[in-house]
Amino acid sequence: MNKNLYLILITIVSALGGLLFGYDTGVINGAQFFLSKYFELNAGMKGWVVGSALLGCLVGALASGKLSMAIGRKGSLIVSAILFSISAWGSGIPSFLPESVDLLVVFRIIGGLGIGIASMCAPMYIAEVSPPKRRGSLVTFYQLGIVVGFFIVFLVTYYIGRNLTEAQNIDFGWRRMFWSELGPSLLFLILLFFVPKSPRWLHLMGRKEEAFEVLKKINEPEVAKKVNAEILDS
């Protein structure tokens, strides 16, 4: 495969972490009116349900440093994808689970953990696999992913809300809004198994030959040697 195309594909896969950041943050906006009616929430509880994901974001972001060192940038992104998937599935509260607003909050916090980890590890991973001259432009893919995520979830929640009656939206429409995140979450999870580990992390783990092999897949041989030397010197 062409090295440039391979690099772009790796970047796009990583940027899905940003897309899910935007999607998970935005989906609650479309669902909040209907789930508030369903659970008969007062203003305080509604605010807690909407804002609870931020608690997970904080914890996820704080934990991401040690996590990314322990299992790598790629491993951390896989964890975030699993958390996004669990949150998307659980926030819709499947019929075999007890219908509780507290349970919804738990799943929203789990999604927030995914956001916090992805917000730190996705741009870090992109920066560490990118050639120095292209690093800045490629990292912006992550920011673009966030905006695209917001836009897609707006379209999805609008479509679901418009094609159901208000009673249907209150009963199950809001569940479908949350479940719609399962698609991109599982896609992110699957694709992550096909991207390489961060060469910088591999160096930190003493796996220098493996790191150089990754660099050669992304860069021309001379550039790979230069970047490898820079990592060794840093």
PLM feature spans:
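Transmembrane-helix signature of 12-pass secondary carriers
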Residues: 1-234
